[in-house]
Each structure stands twice: as C-alpha cells, then as structure tokens.
Amino acid sequence: MGRPGNRLKQFAAILLFAGLAACAGAPSETQAPSPFAALSASANGNGFSENGLAALDVAMASAVDDGHVKGISTLLVRDGEVIHYFTHGIRRAEDQAPVTEDTIFRIYSMSKPLTGVALMTLYEDGAFSLDDPVTKFVPEFADIKVQQGADANGQPILAEMDHVPTMRELMSHTAGFGYGLGGDDPVNQAFRDQAVLGSPDLDTYIAKVAGIPLLFQPGSDWSYSTAVDIQGYVIQKISGKPFGQYLQDEIFAPLGMTDTAFFVPEAKRNRFSDVFSRNAETGEQTPLDAPRFAYREGAFGMEAGGHGLVSTLGDYARFCQ
C-alpha cells in the first residue's frame, strides 16, 4: 500500500552496523563493487566533503584494526541517493568471511524505531488516542503496583497507581516500567530474575511484566524501559495480527525490506553476522553461540519490538528514507 514511504522522510541518514569482536589483526578484505554503487552520487555535489568521508572510512577501519569491533559497515544516504558506502573486517570468525553489503546483523534497539512507526500507523488510522489508558489494550496491567522505596528488611514498599499509564506515557518512557538491563533496584532485578526479555512469546512476557511493580508513578519521571516491547503487544492486540506479521504487511513489504525479520531463514544463514564477546582485560573477542543469539525460525522467543529484529544496511536505509 506504500503508506510508510510517504511518512519516513529524512534529510540525511547515516547508518552504521558493527559486528562486535576481533583482535587487532583481523583481516581487511577488498569487497566486490557494491550494488549501491550504481545509485551513488557525488559527495561534493550533495553537501558532503570527499575528504571528510575519507576520514570517516579511516576512523571506521581503525575501530576494526584496533580491536574494538570485528567488522563494520557504513552507508550514507541523502534524498534517496547513496552518497557513500564502506565496509571493513569480517562478519564470521569460522571462515573469516568479510562484511558485505548484504550482511545480516542483529539490530537490537534499532528495532525500536520500526515498532514506533508501526504503532503510529495505527494512531493515524484512529485506532487509539494518546490519552487512552494502556489497560484498554492490556487489561493485565490494571493492578500493577508502584515501588516506593524499601522497608527495614529491604523489601519493597508498594503503593497503588495514581492513574493507569496512558499510551502517551508508554510511548515516551514515562509510564514507569523497568527493563532489567541495569539498576540494582528490586524492579529491574525482578526483570532479570524472571528473564522477562527472554520470554517465549508476548503473552508470557505481558504476564510477567504485569507482576512487577512500576519504578515510579506514571508520568512522574523518565526511565529507559521495556515500553517498546509492550508497544509491540499493543500493535498485536489492536491489529488482530501477530506483531511480526503486522510489521511485514505494513512496513517491510511496502518498503521492500526483504531481509528484516525476527529470525534468519536457513537460506540466508551464510549472510548472518556472528555476535562477539570482548574480554575487557585481554581484548580477545570470541563468537557467542548460545541459542538466544541464533535467531532461528521457531526458536527465537518473543517478537520483541524493543530489540528483536535482524536487518541489513540496505533494508534499514529504505526505512530511514
């Protein structure tokens, strides 16, 4: 239907994906001409300095050569034209396969803008108001409590919500939800203890979140949170489609984003980048092979709007434009 193409307009987009890992000696390989090259325009003619772009390439290559990341890829797009494209390093440790223009990366929190746009398509269709209570779509949240400190034994003191979080608060990280990515408070610790982000599906995820108190009264503060994952569930409830299917129908397919999804099919596994862990003391970086990093169909857990997608540089450029 093409609707997102009219909405996603930016003056310029610089995209950077990095496969984190590698020691300083990781090989650099010259790539075959990029499919982007046919679309390229003069950098100077589009307001960018050739010298500046060359310096960008040096800086990106240094991130690999100095052992900070395993591989890196950058793409500069303006007004629908590819101005500059660069890769350096490898995507896979086993055979030292280089990063290429079609390498598939785990994009983690860059999933969030896609979820946000998907939710806004429903908003523009009149499916919800910013002042709607979240419980209109997630009734499981009606009885969530609010943490208000701890007692002498270290147990959380809980209070009633003074109001149910609104969609506006959910969409601005002011609803009060935790996340579990940091913080030693009982709320974020509960997210970790219950492996909330590792839930097998969105229904299980929502049930877990409903049992964990808010960090603060809705609207009273800001905290980077699991709110975008909740937004994915709201999209599912409003649309009547699985969240991933809604993304496919309303964003990926109209924009021609053929490599963006919550899993990597077998036919594309060779293009999938490793994810690496870096030893802070030695600098050594090794690929992680736990199942949660594999992103295989049927085994990737919930469709997480906040962190769960994979994509390519080209796909994300289409989205940004």
Task: Label every PLM stretch briefly.
Residues 2-12:
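Bacterial N-terminal signal peptides that target proteins for export
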Residues 21-22:
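C-terminal motif of bacterial Sec signal peptides marking the signal peptidase cleavage site
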Residues 33-44:
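Acidic/histidine-rich, surface-exposed loop or edge segments in extracytoplasmic proteins
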Residues 45-107, 127-129, 143-150:
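Short, conserved catalytic-motif segment at the N-terminal edge
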Residues 54-61, 74, 80, 105-138, ...:
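Active-site SXXK
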Residues 86, 132, 241:
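Short beta-to-alpha loop/turn elements within the nucleotide-binding domains of ABC transporters
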Residues 92, 139, 143-321:
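Short, surface-exposed loop or secondary-structure junction motifs
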